[in-house]
Amino acid sequence: MAVYTKINKKDIVSINNQFEMEKITHFKGIKKGIENTNYLLKTKKNKFILTIFEKRVSDKEIPFFMKLMYLLNNSNINCPKPLKSKNGSHLIKLKNKKACIVSFVNGKDKIKLNLKNCFEVGKIIANIHEITKKIKISRKNSMGIKELEPLLKSIKFRSKKFSNLQKFLTNNLKEIKKNWPSKLPQGIIHGDLFIDNIFFIKYKLL
Protein backbone atom coordinates (compact mmCIF):
# COMPACT_ATOMS: atom_id res chain seq x y z
CA MET A 1 0.00 0.00 0.00
CA ALA A 2 1.54 3.32 -1.05
CA VAL A 3 -1.27 5.84 -0.66
CA TYR A 4 -0.37 7.27 2.73
CA THR A 5 -1.55 10.83 2.00
CA LYS A 6 -5.12 11.30 0.77
CA ILE A 7 -5.94 14.15 -1.61
CA ASN A 8 -9.26 15.57 -2.78
CA LYS A 9 -10.69 17.69 -5.59
CA LYS A 10 -9.65 20.90 -3.83
CA ASP A 11 -6.04 19.69 -3.88
CA ILE A 12 -6.34 18.88 -7.58
CA VAL A 13 -7.53 22.43 -8.30
CA SER A 14 -4.52 23.74 -6.35
CA ILE A 15 -2.18 21.53 -8.40
CA ASN A 16 -3.75 22.69 -11.65
CA ASN A 17 -3.28 26.32 -10.64
CA GLN A 18 0.44 25.78 -10.03
CA PHE A 19 1.31 24.14 -13.37
CA GLU A 20 0.90 25.05 -17.03
CA MET A 21 -1.12 21.95 -17.85
CA GLU A 22 -4.56 20.91 -19.03
CA LYS A 23 -7.33 20.53 -16.51
CA ILE A 24 -6.96 17.35 -14.47
CA THR A 25 -10.12 15.33 -15.05
CA HIS A 26 -9.34 12.21 -13.03
CA PHE A 27 -7.01 11.12 -10.23
CA LYS A 28 -6.44 7.73 -8.62
CA GLY A 29 -4.07 6.43 -5.94
CA ILE A 30 -1.42 3.91 -6.99
CA LYS A 31 -0.98 1.05 -4.53
CA LYS A 32 2.41 -0.14 -5.80
CA GLY A 33 5.50 1.04 -3.97
CA ILE A 34 6.36 1.36 -0.29
CA GLU A 35 7.99 4.73 0.42
CA ASN A 36 5.98 7.57 -1.12
CA THR A 37 2.39 8.34 -2.03
CA ASN A 38 1.68 8.19 -5.76
CA TYR A 39 -1.35 9.20 -7.81
CA LEU A 40 -2.15 8.78 -11.49
CA LEU A 41 -3.43 12.08 -12.91
CA LYS A 42 -5.34 12.24 -16.18
CA THR A 43 -6.12 15.20 -18.42
CA LYS A 44 -8.00 15.09 -21.71
CA LYS A 45 -4.81 14.30 -23.66
CA ASN A 46 -2.14 13.17 -21.20
CA LYS A 47 -1.30 11.21 -18.07
CA PHE A 48 1.02 12.23 -15.25
CA ILE A 49 2.25 10.84 -11.94
CA LEU A 50 1.92 12.89 -8.76
CA THR A 51 4.40 11.87 -6.05
CA ILE A 52 4.02 13.08 -2.47
CA PHE A 53 7.25 12.54 -0.55
CA GLU A 54 6.73 10.88 2.81
CA LYS A 55 8.82 11.01 6.00
CA ARG A 56 11.65 8.62 5.06
CA VAL A 57 12.77 10.85 2.19
CA SER A 58 14.97 13.77 3.26
CA ASP A 59 13.70 17.12 1.96
CA LYS A 60 17.23 18.28 1.18
CA GLU A 61 17.84 15.28 -1.12
CA ILE A 62 14.70 15.63 -3.26
CA PRO A 63 16.06 18.42 -5.56
CA PHE A 64 18.98 16.11 -6.51
CA PHE A 65 16.60 13.46 -7.83
CA MET A 66 14.48 16.04 -9.65
CA LYS A 67 17.51 17.48 -11.42
CA LEU A 68 18.89 14.02 -12.21
CA MET A 69 15.64 12.83 -13.81
CA TYR A 70 15.35 16.07 -15.76
CA LEU A 71 18.92 15.77 -17.10
CA LEU A 72 18.58 12.06 -17.93
CA ASN A 73 15.33 12.65 -19.79
CA ASN A 74 17.00 15.40 -21.80
CA SER A 75 19.79 12.90 -22.61
CA ASN A 76 17.28 10.52 -24.25
CA ILE A 77 16.95 8.17 -21.28
CA ASN A 78 13.32 7.08 -21.17
CA CYS A 79 12.57 7.99 -17.57
CA PRO A 80 9.90 10.24 -16.03
CA LYS A 81 10.52 13.95 -16.56
CA PRO A 82 9.63 16.32 -13.71
CA LEU A 83 7.33 19.19 -14.66
CA LYS A 84 8.29 22.70 -13.67
CA SER A 85 5.65 24.72 -11.85
CA LYS A 86 4.75 28.27 -12.83
CA ASN A 87 7.40 29.58 -10.43
CA GLY A 88 10.10 27.47 -12.11
CA SER A 89 10.44 24.83 -9.38
CA HIS A 90 10.03 21.07 -9.77
CA LEU A 91 8.58 20.89 -6.25
CA ILE A 92 5.35 22.12 -4.72
CA LYS A 93 3.86 21.92 -1.22
CA LEU A 94 0.87 19.62 -0.82
CA LYS A 95 -0.67 18.57 2.50
CA ASN A 96 2.37 20.13 4.22
CA LYS A 97 4.68 17.80 2.28
CA LYS A 98 6.93 18.16 -0.76
CA ALA A 99 5.40 16.88 -3.99
CA CYS A 100 6.17 16.75 -7.70
CA ILE A 101 4.51 15.84 -10.98
CA VAL A 102 6.36 13.77 -13.58
CA SER A 103 5.51 12.62 -17.08
CA PHE A 104 3.81 9.24 -17.44
CA VAL A 105 5.90 6.41 -18.90
CA ASN A 106 3.83 3.94 -20.90
CA GLY A 107 4.32 0.19 -20.74
CA LYS A 108 4.05 -2.58 -18.18
CA ASP A 109 6.46 -4.43 -15.97
CA LYS A 110 7.16 -8.14 -16.50
CA ILE A 111 6.90 -10.80 -13.82
CA LYS A 112 10.01 -12.54 -15.12
CA LEU A 113 12.87 -11.16 -17.22
CA ASN A 114 14.71 -13.27 -19.79
CA LEU A 115 18.40 -12.98 -20.73
CA LYS A 116 17.65 -10.57 -23.59
CA ASN A 117 15.68 -8.30 -21.25
CA CYS A 118 18.55 -8.30 -18.74
CA PHE A 119 21.05 -7.47 -21.49
CA GLU A 120 18.89 -4.51 -22.62
CA VAL A 121 18.55 -3.25 -19.06
CA GLY A 122 22.31 -3.53 -18.62
CA LYS A 123 22.94 -1.43 -21.73
CA ILE A 124 20.66 1.35 -20.50
CA ILE A 125 22.25 1.32 -17.04
CA ALA A 126 25.70 1.53 -18.66
CA ASN A 127 24.44 4.48 -20.72
CA ILE A 128 23.21 6.19 -17.55
CA HIS A 129 26.63 5.68 -15.96
CA GLU A 130 28.37 7.26 -18.96
CA ILE A 131 25.95 10.21 -19.09
CA THR A 132 26.19 10.94 -15.36
CA LYS A 133 30.00 11.06 -15.50
CA LYS A 134 29.52 14.41 -17.23
CA ILE A 135 26.85 15.70 -14.85
CA LYS A 136 28.21 17.78 -11.99
CA ILE A 137 25.70 16.81 -9.32
CA SER A 138 26.17 14.43 -6.42
CA ARG A 139 24.76 13.40 -3.07
CA LYS A 140 25.93 11.49 -0.03
CA ASN A 141 25.01 7.80 -0.21
CA SER A 142 22.55 7.36 2.65
CA MET A 143 23.04 3.57 2.42
CA GLY A 144 26.83 3.65 2.02
CA ILE A 145 29.47 1.84 4.05
CA LYS A 146 29.70 4.66 6.63
CA GLU A 147 25.96 4.47 7.27
CA LEU A 148 25.79 0.70 7.92
CA GLU A 149 27.11 0.78 11.50
CA PRO A 150 24.63 3.45 12.72
CA LEU A 151 21.88 1.52 10.90
CA LEU A 152 22.82 -1.71 12.66
CA LYS A 153 22.98 0.03 16.05
CA SER A 154 19.50 1.48 15.48
CA ILE A 155 17.96 -2.00 15.22
CA LYS A 156 16.24 -3.02 18.45
CA PHE A 157 16.50 -6.80 18.78
CA ARG A 158 13.53 -7.30 21.12
CA SER A 159 13.85 -11.06 21.55
CA LYS A 160 16.76 -13.25 22.70
CA LYS A 161 16.08 -15.59 19.80
CA PHE A 162 17.53 -12.88 17.52
CA SER A 163 20.81 -12.60 19.46
CA ASN A 164 22.58 -14.91 16.98
CA LEU A 165 21.34 -12.73 14.13
CA GLN A 166 22.70 -9.61 15.84
CA LYS A 167 26.08 -11.31 16.29
CA PHE A 168 26.04 -12.51 12.68
CA LEU A 169 25.33 -9.01 11.33
CA THR A 170 27.95 -7.39 13.59
CA ASN A 171 30.66 -9.85 12.54
CA ASN A 172 29.77 -9.51 8.88
CA LEU A 173 29.90 -5.73 9.07
CA LYS A 174 33.37 -5.92 10.62
CA GLU A 175 34.49 -8.19 7.78
CA ILE A 176 33.01 -5.87 5.15
CA LYS A 177 34.73 -2.81 6.65
CA LYS A 178 38.02 -4.69 6.88
CA ASN A 179 37.94 -5.63 3.19
CA TRP A 180 36.34 -2.45 1.82
CA PRO A 181 38.46 -1.03 -1.08
CA SER A 182 40.10 2.28 -0.15
CA LYS A 183 39.88 3.67 -3.70
CA LEU A 184 36.52 2.37 -4.84
CA PRO A 185 35.26 4.25 -7.94
CA GLN A 186 32.29 6.50 -7.24
CA GLY A 187 29.42 7.70 -9.37
CA ILE A 188 25.65 7.93 -9.76
CA ILE A 189 23.85 4.57 -9.86
CA HIS A 190 20.25 3.39 -10.17
CA GLY A 191 19.69 2.38 -6.56
CA ASP A 192 16.11 1.18 -7.01
CA LEU A 193 16.36 -1.24 -9.93
CA PHE A 194 13.53 -3.74 -9.51
CA ILE A 195 11.40 -5.51 -12.12
CA ASP A 196 8.33 -3.48 -11.16
CA ASN A 197 9.92 -0.25 -12.42
CA ILE A 198 11.29 -1.61 -15.70
CA PHE A 199 8.63 -1.10 -18.36
CA PHE A 200 8.05 -2.94 -21.64
CA ILE A 201 5.70 -2.47 -24.59
CA LYS A 202 5.14 -5.68 -26.55
CA TYR A 203 8.27 -7.23 -25.02
CA LYS A 204 10.39 -4.21 -26.01
CA LEU A 205 12.18 -2.36 -23.23
CA LEU A 206 11.32 1.34 -23.11
Task: Describe the role of every protein-language-model region.
Residues 19-42:
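ATP-binding glycine-rich phosphate-binding loop
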Residues 112-164, 184-186:
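A cross-family kinase active-site recognition segment
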Residues 1-26:
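Juxta-kinase regulatory segment immediately upstream of eukaryotic protein kinase catalytic domains
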Residues 18-25, 169-182:
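Short Pro/Gly-enriched beta-strand edge/turn motifs at strand-loop
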Residues 25-28, 80-83, 206:
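A short, local hydrophobic-aromatic micro-motif
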Residues 34-42, 49-50, 82, 174-206:
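Active-site acidic catalytic loop and adjacent metal/ATP-binding pocket
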Residues 10, 74-76, 146-174, 178:
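Asparagine-rich low-complexity intrinsically disordered tracts
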Residues 43-136:
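ATP-binding pocket architecture of kinase catalytic cores
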